[in-house]
From Swiss-Prot:
Keywords: ATP-binding, Disulfide bond, Endoplasmic reticulum, Glycoprotein, Golgi apparatus, Kinase, Manganese, Metal-binding, Nucleotide-binding, Signal, Transferase
Keyword Signal found: yes
Domain of life: Eukaryota
Cofactor: Mn(2+)
Function: Kylose kinase that mediates the 2-O-phosphorylation of xylose in the glycosaminoglycan-protein linkage region of proteoglycans.
Glycan-carrying positions: N83
Name of this chain's protein: Glycosaminoglycan xylosylkinase homolog
Keyword Endoplasmic reticulum tagged: yes
Broadest EC class assigned to this enzyme: transferase
Length: 421
């Protein structure tokens, strides 16, 4: 073979290699109209690649964290109070659009103590919904919702992402996570140990009392067990007090104002043999961008990051207050610390949009400090520790995934993916 033939053969081989490489690239990325990946599996492969090559700033502590940490610790520190009625008024005055409470307010520490300490004056069943909840009145007729404990902290919930009953401490953790990430769209929540006999049964209305079974053993000791009233409530599944009739639970401050319930565009089918369109269509968001206001879409993308971190895959509907998304009902989080359901992030990786303020805030809590600050904030709660170490590791692992997904979107959209709405 002469020199010219060798050169030609080399050029042909190079072109063939480029063609095959390009073909692989476009099959893998499926530039499909806007450069979206072909499937969730392709996305997962890309995320793994991104996570192996994350920039050091995502793995190390952000120097700005310490300023945020000090402000948060000061704001949420338990504080004594004198007049609960005044604090109820302040909390009812706080909400603006979907912001349930202000970024910083000296009354927050007092309000949390008020929720922990004010006496229960009346209790009734809150029949709506699928989960057991009670409507509790505290002093000055302030209404709150009570959710009881169903599982010990370390129990792993197997099955689908939405399996099992509510995890009570997830509601408290969601409150602190929202405060830290500036998603102040959750209700204010505290943990509280209540006496099923003296505070629930004795203060309950006749209908509630009928949903509490009282058993007496051979030694004359009573056992109180609550089954309540809801869609799935029944006498075979009860919450029982300990030897002193105490049960763990959470008190959830009812968000003032009118809330509208809306179906999520990323709703699951809840059927094993049927998938929703968004689960297979990586360009699903394209049509939504033409139908939905950008501010609403950005709210839902923020919500998806919030839900992904705690693994709440049950937001089939969402609530709005003054046309802005609020994060009500966060109890289906922290089911299995070893699983990360990436599809909860579908709004982010399908739309490749994100608020600039959200992205800036997420980066403040890099390097393992997100769970550290929430742990410190929640030490004053009656139910501390709220989650296990395995769940904490899961939160930090998922934050790295969020960083990787945003990096992937930046490869496609550049800085134009960030919005200031």
């Amino acid at each position: 073979m002469n020199k010219r033939s060798v050169i030609i053969a080399g050029i042909v081989a190079s072109l063939l290699g480029l063609a095959l490489g390009a073909n692989f690239y476009f099959m893998y990325y499926l530039s499909a109209e806007e450069g979206h990946l072909a499937s969730v599996r392709a996305l997962e492969n890309m995320i793994r690649h991104k996570m192996r090559h994350l920039k050091p700033n995502y793995l190390n502590r952000n120097p700005r964290f310490f300023m945020f940490r000090n402000k948060l610790l000061k704001n949420y520190k338990a504080a004594p109070y004198e007049n609960a009625s005044v604090l109820w008024d302040i909390a009812n005055w706080w909400p603006h659009e979907n912001e349930v409470y202000p970024l910083y307010d000296s009354s927050m520490g007092q309000l949390l103590e008020t929720l922990r300490r004010e006496p229960i004056t009346r209790v009734s069943n809150l029949g709506r919904g699928t989960q057991l909840k009670l409507l509790v009145r505290l002093s000055h007729q302030q209404k709150v919702i009570f959710k009881p404990q169903w599982y010990p902290r370390e129990e792993v919930i197997d099955g689908m992402i939405y399996s099992g009953k509510d995890r009570h401490t997830a509601e408290v953790y969601a409150f602190y996570l929202g405060a830290v990430l500036d998603f102040r769209w959750t209700p204010i929540v505290v943990g509280r140990v209540v006496n099923l006999k003296k505070e629930i049964y004795a203060k309950g209305d006749p209908e509630l009392q009928q949903t509490i079974n009282i058993e007496t053993d051979e030694d004359g000791r009573e056992k109180y067990c609550l089954f309540g009233k809801c869609h799935y409530c029944n006498e075979e599944e009860t919450v029982c007090g300990d030897e002193r009739h105490n049960i763990e639970g959470v008190l959830i401050y009812i968000v003032p104002g009118t809330l509208a319930k809306r179906r999520s565009p990323w709703q699951r089918t809840y059927k094993d043999d049927k998938r929703a369109p968004w689960e297979d269509d990586m360009t699903y968001c394209k049509s939504l961008k033409n139908k939905m206001e950008t501010i609403r879409l950005l709210d839902l993308i923020d919500a998806s990051i919030f839900d992904y971190l705690i693994q709440n895959g049950d937001r089939h509907h969402y609530e709005t207050r003054e046309e802005r998304v609020v994060l009500i009902d966060n109890g289906k989080a922290f089911g299995n610390p070893n699983k990360d359901h990436l599809d909860i992030l579908a709004p982010l990786y399908q739309c490749c949009l994100l608020r600039k303020s959200t992205w800036d805030r997420l980066q403040v809590f890099s390097g393992g400090v997100l769970t550290e600050i929430i742990d410190r904030l929640s030490k004053q709660d009656a139910l501390y520790p709220l989650i296990t170490d395995k769940h904490k590791k899961g939160v930090e692992r998922r934050l790295l995934v969020v960083y990787a997904v945003v990096e992937h979107c930046m490869d496609i959209e550049g800085d134009k993916m960030f919005k200031t709405l």
